[in-house]
Every structure is written in structure tokens, then in C-alpha cells.
Amino acid sequence: MFRNIQKRNISSSGRVLLNHGKPQNPVYNAELTMKIEPIQRTGESIDVKRARLVYQSRKRGILESDLLLSRFAKRYLSGFSQEELDEYDKLLDEPDWDIYYWATKNYDVTPLPDKWKNSKILKLLQEDAENKEKEILRMPEL
């Protein structure tokens, strides 16, 4: 059955032009920004809010943020007042990588906006992210 199949030589020139000589990844001058407004929650009890914030701290989608925020939530959320919980809730509405870079004080990658410069919650998160105890970071138990 396969005796009559001829071998084919497939060759190409050593020179391949992609995108007709144009750069593969063109530089765009315009910055695309899209912000999805957070859900406005009304009538949420403080216990439900704490539980939601713990969940949102653990399930960010980026491991680095998950580790920092879940550890922070485990340590501090139970003692936060309503105002502190509201501020932490607003912080969690920010993009994951921004929170990570702000927590690690890496402002050259993502500059810190004015609205977070005097945040005591962010300062507490930054102190926690320094990991002065040199603990191995892992997700806290539920």
C-alpha cells in the first residue's frame, strides 16, 4: 500500500521574511487602559465582608499576589475596623500586579498613585511583605 508513495524534498531558502520586513512587535505609542468598575455592595455585614475579603485575597490569579495578600488577610483582617476593611476592599479593586509592585515598593515598575500614598493599610501590607521574620511564604490554612 505504501510502496507507490514517493519521497518529497521540502526545502526553503535560508532567508525567511516575516511581516514583509516590518518589526515583529511594533511599538505602540498609545496606552490602552480599561477599568471595570467594582461591584457596589450594600447591606453586607462585617462578617460577610471579612469572609469575602479573605476569599478575594486568596484567589487573585497571580501566585505572588496570592501569597502576599492571603498571608496579610490571615494576620490582620480579623482585627480591622469597618473603615479599614473598606480601605482594604478598595485596594483589592486595583490590578494584581500593581498591588504586588506597591507592596514590594517597586515604584519604578508601577508608580504609586496619590490616593494610596497615605494609606495605612498599604503601609501595613508593605511591612508584612518585607518578611522580616524570613518565613517561607505559603498559602495559610483555611
Swiss-Prot record:
One of its GO terms (cellular component) is mitochondrial matrix. One of its GO terms (biological process) is mitochondrial electron transport, succinate to ubiquinone. SUPFAM superfamilies: YgfY-like (SSF109910). It is found in: Mitochondrion matrix. Pfam families: Sdh5. Its main location: mitochondrion. Belongs to the SDHAF2 family. Interacts with the flavoprotein subunit within the SDH catalytic dimer. This protein may be expected to contain an N-terminal transit peptide but none has been predicted. This is Succinate dehydrogenase assembly factor 2, mitochondrial.
